[in-house]
Amino acid sequence: MSPARITDFSPGKPRKALLCIHGAGCSAAIFRVQISKLRVALKNEFEFVYATAPFSSSPGPGVLPVFQGMGPYYTWFQKHHDAVTNTTTPTVGDRVAAVIGPVQKTVQDWSITNPQAPIVGIVAFSEGALVATLLLHQQQMGKLPWFPKMSIAVLICCFYSDEARDYMRAEAQDDDDKLIINVPTLHLHGRQDFALQGSRQMVETHYLPQNADVLEFQGKHNFPNRPSDVQETVKRFQQLYQKVKMSGSFV
């Protein structure tokens, strides 16, 4: 049985919505808690819509002990040794295809039941931030006609890999210009995060400098916790949001 869809929706208030993509070994319910400070700060502007990854997994980095007993936990990509069937190892393309289904269902269910609150942006963490980047890149390559036009994205502590980079480069037919995603983004990087170098590399490889605002905070693989970092995160998002609104990118 698929997990129930989780949203933060207030009836009677037509707004815009943000698609939320959790990390590996996590869940929509846990991610809702992880970004609670951001949700509270943006509650007058946005609804939050949560997608759930397709594969069961053990708890991911930073999930325990805080979220002990809050399973089941899910991951977006199966490991090679878990996904082998008849000695056939799935390609990156196969694994990207596997994440599309649950995201598409989340988007379409929301669009049908809440047409007054279109999805216009993304909030994604860790492996979910990689999923978001892959989806944005696929859309920019003329694929995913069902995927909403994203005007803004917040990517938190992205887990990035050479394998993902090589896949996107192959999709772009080695045209570096086609590797660049033209969406205004806020990137949150923990200075003590094990994934910091990959997060930086993803920004350099896939996002326009003039559209990518990078905030490095004192922390590990988590959403910012210190009040000053939370305030700066909200301030940067609101500045980016106002810039996007002024450009007329929101419908």
From Swiss-Prot:
EC number: 3.1.2.-
Function: Esterase; part of the gene cluster that mediates the biosynthesis of compactin, also known as mevastatin or ML-236B, and which acts as a potent competitive inhibitor of HMG-CoA reductase. Compactin biosynthesis is performed in two stages. The first stage is catalyzed by the nonaketide synthase mlcA, which belongs to type I polyketide synthases and catalyzes the iterative nine-step formation of the polyketide.
Gene Ontology annotations of biological process type: antibiotic biosynthetic process; monocarboxylic acid biosynthetic process; secondary metabolite biosynthetic process
Reaction equations catalysed: dihydro-ML-236C-[compactin nonaketide synthase] + H2O = holo-[compactin nonaketide synthase] + dihydro-ML-236C carboxylate + H(+)
Upregulation: Expression is induced at the beginning of the stationary phase, which is consistent with the timing of compactin production. Expression is controlled by the ML-236B/compactin cluster transcription regulator mlcR.
Signal peptide region: none
Gene Ontology CC: cytoplasm; nucleus
EC top class, as a word: hydrolase
GO molecular-function term, one example from the UniProt record: hydrolase activity
Family listed: Belongs to the LovG family.
Active site residues according to the UniProt entry: 126 (charge relay system), 193 (charge relay system), 221 (charge relay system)
Keywords: Hydrolase
Organism of provenance: Penicillium citrinum
Listed name of the protein: Esterase mlcF
Biotech exploitation of the protein: Compactin (also known as mevastatin or ML-236B) and the intermediary metabolites Ml-236C and ML-236A are inhibitors of HMG-CoA reductase involved in cholesterogenesis. Their hypocholesterolemic activity might be useful for lowering cholesterol levels in the blood and reduce artherosclerosis and coronary heart disease.
Annotated SUPFAM superfamilies: alpha/beta-Hydrolases
Pathway recorded for this protein: Polyketide biosynthesis
Family matches, as Pfam families: FSH1
